[in-house]
């Protein structure tokens, strides 16, 4: 139907007849001449119809979002009327003929006025919202990124192998989406939270290198960077170690960013231990573009009478830290400090102490804060020395249980970095390694990553004789600008170690056999050393396109209640369907 896309129309085609198809983006009548901006996925091109044209009446009748096909001759625009904002801006098409393929009702919102349109309206009419050039750019970038990844992995010997969507429920932390079986009454499939076990079984099968661009499903409470269904770049390889995975993935991600948006990452990426990340930034996914670090002052506060600090300072499960904000005296108002106090309260902090450093030569008198009177001058100036604070700086303090301090002050660090625009570079990729094998909650151990991550032990005897809370794992996460974009590990490849890890997690032998018997059996039939990683496609595309909402990079996303406003899913089904599946719906009591 067409000879060219809009972006193909340029001065090289001057005098040539072309055919274009698309939507009427804008219609203007200037002195009896009709100007039409025609939009397709590549951009805009201007179409001109003069009054003496046989199709002038048709052109005059067009309205926004009509779908048309037009023929005409490419002509240079009059001098001074070029449009530098579009690739076809030096030319226009002098229309010969035009065909209305389809009319359009008045759309629910104007594409140029999307910012004043509610999110619910845009999701209900997603097919309209996706016509916006900004949205099309994001999804085109997604397509290019996935194509690059496929080519890279194909060229490096990885095989694209599909794994099942209807599988066994083996909870991995979040709730499963369950699918009832019609053939086996009362039994259910689960939609996979990841292809974890299947990709390991492919290594047992001898395929050596595997990848898949795959949908995964988690029935969990949603955030701005989460969706119930999401896409992973899933990767596994045999006879490898951490260095192989990390170096290969660095090449892939560095190449992806260069190819897609022209950004060059220095390799190898910085490597940081989990312990260092928590100690310095309160987070296992720190944004290293922000030049603010925690300073531990626990020992300095142990003998102070100020119980807010000395209490946690003498508690092994707590920490006391200072966070220096250079020039914070002038940059942070009292109102902002009050807002930050409320902000850290979201994470469980009981308050936010601070000290403004007005003068270093006046002793305590040069320090401004409600807490100054409660702490000795000697300790105050030790803290100032430790933090390298200068006149005009402001110190924030976190004191309490380690998790609360890490979460609250880590979030505060990121917020201040954004509020004050402290970013010292555009991109900061790194690896976080040496994660704890387990984390403890309610006096029970949980896998920090998942139960198939290999611990840093060489035998089951080492595993038995080591305090589980002191075990490190062979896990690694890739972090870019504060986002965990990928996570993986070397896997357990010996049956006795896997069985013991299940045991440490409180999974009985019978339960392990019921849920993971097929995996335990496979590990007894000659399993190679293997490991892998999974990248969140949606998060990567967020970074590549500069958006902060995952819904912007998915064609048809769900809301924060996991519903689709466009199709009205989830929906009820007929009683006949329920009876066929042997399911009775329990009505919610109100």
Swiss-Prot record:
It is found in: Cytoplasm. SUPFAM superfamilies: Class II aaRS and biotin synthetases, GAD domain-like, Nucleic acid-binding proteins. It catalyses: tRNA(Asx) + L-aspartate + ATP = L-aspartyl-tRNA(Asx) + AMP + diphosphate. One of its GO terms (molecular function) is nucleic acid binding. InterPro entries: Aa-tRNA-synt_II, aa-tRNA-synth_II, aa-tRNA-synth_II/BPL/LPL, Asp-tRNA-ligase_1, Asp-tRNA-ligase_1_N, Asp/Asn-tRNA-synth_IIb, AspRS_core, GAD-like_sf. GO terms for biological process: aspartyl-tRNA aminoacylation. It is an enzyme of class 6 (ligase). Belongs to the class-II aminoacyl-tRNA synthetase family. Type 1 subfamily. This is Aspartate--tRNA(Asp/Asn) ligase. It comes from Francisella tularensis subsp. tularensis (strain WY96-3418). The gene is aspS.
């Amino acid at each position: 139907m067409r000879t060219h896309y809009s972006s193909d129309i340029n001065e090289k085609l001057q005098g040539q007849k072309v055919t274009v198809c698309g939507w009427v983006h804008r219609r203007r009548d200037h002195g009896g001449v009709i100007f039409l901006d025609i939009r397709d996925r590549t951009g805009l091109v201007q179409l001109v119809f003069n009054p003496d044209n046989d199709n002038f009446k048709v052109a005059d009748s067009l309205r926004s979002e009509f779908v048309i096909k037009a023929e005409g001759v490419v002509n240079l625009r009059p001098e001074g009327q070029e449009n530098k904002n579009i690739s076809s801006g030096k030319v226009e098409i002098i229309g010969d003929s035009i065909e209305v393929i389809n009319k359009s009702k008045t759309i629910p919102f104007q594409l140029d006025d999307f910012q004043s349109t509610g999110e619910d309206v845009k999701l209900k009419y997603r097919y309209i919202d996706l016509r916006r050039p900004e949205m099309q750019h994001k999804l085109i970038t997604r397509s290019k990124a996935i194509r690059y990844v496929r080519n890279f992995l194909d060229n490096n010997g990885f095989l694209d192998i599909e794994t099942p969507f209807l599988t066994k429920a083996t909870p991995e932390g979040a709730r499963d989406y369950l699918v009832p079986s019609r053939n086996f009454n009362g039994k259910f499939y689960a939609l996979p939270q990841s292809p974890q076990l299947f990709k390991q079984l492919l290594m047992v099968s001898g395929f050596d290198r595997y990848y898949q661009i795959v949908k995964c499903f988690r029935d969990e409470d949603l955030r701005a960077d989460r969706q119930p269904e999401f896409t992973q770049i899933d990767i596994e390889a045999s006879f490898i170690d951490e260095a192989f995975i990390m170096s290969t993935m660095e090449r892939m991600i560095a190449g992806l960013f260069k190819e897609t948006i022209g950004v060059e990452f220095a390799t190898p990426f910085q490597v940081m231990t989990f312990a260092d990340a928590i100690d310095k930034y309160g987070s296992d996914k720190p944004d290293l573009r922000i030049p603010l670090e925690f300073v531990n002052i626990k020992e300095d506060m142990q003998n102070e009478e100020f119980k807010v600090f000395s209490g946690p300072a003498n508690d092994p499960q707590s920490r006391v830290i200072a966070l220096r904000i250079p020039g914070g005296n002038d940059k942070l108002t009292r109102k902002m400090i009050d807002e930050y106090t409320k902000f850290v309260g979201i994470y469980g902090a009981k308050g936010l102490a601070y000290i403004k450093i007005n003068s270093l030569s006046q002793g305590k008198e040069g320090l401004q804060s409600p807490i100054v009177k409660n702490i000795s001058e000697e300790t105050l100036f030790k803290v100032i020395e430790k933090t390298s604070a200068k006149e005009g700086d402001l110190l924030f303090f976190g004191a309490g249980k380690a998790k609360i301090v890490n979460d609250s002050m880590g979030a505060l660090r990121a917020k201040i970095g954004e509020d004050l625009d402290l970013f010292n570079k555009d991109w900061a990729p790194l690896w976080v390694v040496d994660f704890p094998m387990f984390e403890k909650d309610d006096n029970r151990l949980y896998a920090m990553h998942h139960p198939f991550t290999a611990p840093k032990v060489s035998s089951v005897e080492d595993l038995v004789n080591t305090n589980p809370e002191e075990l490190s794992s062979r896990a690694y996460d890739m972090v870019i600008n504060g986002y965990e974009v990928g996570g993986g590990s070397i896997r357990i490849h010996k049956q006795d170690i896997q069985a013991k890890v299940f045991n440490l997690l409180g999974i009985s032998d019978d339960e392990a056999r019921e849920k993971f018997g097929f995996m335990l059996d496979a590990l007894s039939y000659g399993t190679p050393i293997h490991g892998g990683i999974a990248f969140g496609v949606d998060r990567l595309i967020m970074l590549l396109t500069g958006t902060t909402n995952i819904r912007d990079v998915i064609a048809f996303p769900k809301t924060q209640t996991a519903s689709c406003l466009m199709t009205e899913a989830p929906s009820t089904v007929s009683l006949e369907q329920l009876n066929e599946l042997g399911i009775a719906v329990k009505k919610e009591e109100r």
